Amino acid sequence: MTTFSEKEKIQLLADIVELQTENNNEIDVCNYLKDLFDKYDIKSEILKVNEHRANFVAEIGSGSPILALSGHMDVVDAGNQDNWTYPPFQLTEKDDKLYGRGTTDMKGGLMALVIALIELKEQNQLPQGTIRLLATAGEEKEQEGAKLLADKGYLDDVDGLMIAEPTGSGIYYAHKGSMSCKVTATGKAVHSSVPFIGDNAIDTLLEFYNQFKEKYAELKKNDTKHELDVAPMFKSLIGKDISEEDANYASGLTAVCSIINGGKQFNSVPDEASLEFNVRPVPEYDNDFIESFFQNIINNVDSNKLSLDIPSNHRPVTSDKNSKLITTIKDVASSYVDKDDIFVSALVGATDASSFLGDNKDNVDLAIFGPGNPLMAHQIDEYIEKDMYLKYIDIFKEASIQYLKEK
């Protein structure tokens, strides 16, 4: 039994794909969802982050247990739209694929949750407990929306949290964190013909970077035991097992220098230069360790000339890989997809769970699971398979019913 026809389910997704939320303007999706939920007499609210950014919260049922279902409303920039085969902000159905920015990451997953929630309410299928929908702003960058919801206590009483990021047949119980670390060197600018009376900031920065590479290589050499196992994820992505060495490397801490800036013109000694790193913390080497790691190198080089800024700081998240939520999703999904394709793994990326759970993470069943091929995220001509989008609505409904009944 369904409340919406297949055509209506696709149109609902089309409606929010048309709302351009490239790292902003989630308020438009919130207003759309508010009107939709009001139509079905479902209690909901909009919580503003700022004038244009907001979260949306809706709830059905009452009492315990409480299952939170979450998805983010922002999408990444579409880039040069001339490079797209189909308009990025207009849903296009072609060869059983639904094209558009955010179809995979992750308006497809979000709308699947929305439809599941409405149909559960309309069909009076909720056996007991509460389902709380948390649609967030700003996941792609600073997780402002998730932080606001956590600060206001929307996760304090939940028993389970499912985030419908695009995972295909993967079910994730944990993931790495993510940190942006910017190291800035300062010097003294002079004309390049008299460099000896100046102080080249690039030289100081290179000294830092050389020491960083040396210390990082030492750390990775000893980084051999990990709580997180990401090997099943990579096996799914590349279609074969990865070597033990590669699995060990991928499951541990990683740090990449991704941006370098220094100097403004060739005939001036630069007085400022910077390096920016993306670091993926793990339980063994967490965010506090990373900050100390960078600061110790800075102190060793010259703390008067070097400074550290951490504009983005999301912690790794762990949970029980055999939790009731994980096993329930695995059991339900096996009726819709090939059982041999289903796997449970840790994830190398980060999600809103970093901001949602905080100190409460040990008490919450976590599952990251949703429709879409993760390799399609952020791509030109992004699409979600129509059949997968529709199937996951039913998976979400059945898994929610079973989890709340048996938790």
From Swiss-Prot:
GO biological process terms held by the UniProt record: diaminopimelate biosynthetic process; lysine biosynthetic process via diaminopimelate
Cofactor(s) listed in the protein's UniProt record: Zn(2+); Co(2+)
Residues the entry annotates as binding Zn(2+) 1: 72, 105, 165
Pathway(s) of this molecule: Amino-acid biosynthesis; L-lysine biosynthesis via DAP pathway; LL-2,6-diaminopimelate from (S)-tetrahydrodipicolinate (succinylase route): step 3/3
Swiss-Prot/TrEMBL keywords: Amino-acid biosynthesis, Cobalt, Diaminopimelate biosynthesis, Hydrolase, Lysine biosynthesis, Metal-binding, Zinc
Residues that bind Zn(2+) 2: 105, 140, 378
Family note: Belongs to the peptidase M20A family.
UniProt-recorded name of the protein: Probable succinyl-diaminopimelate desuccinylase
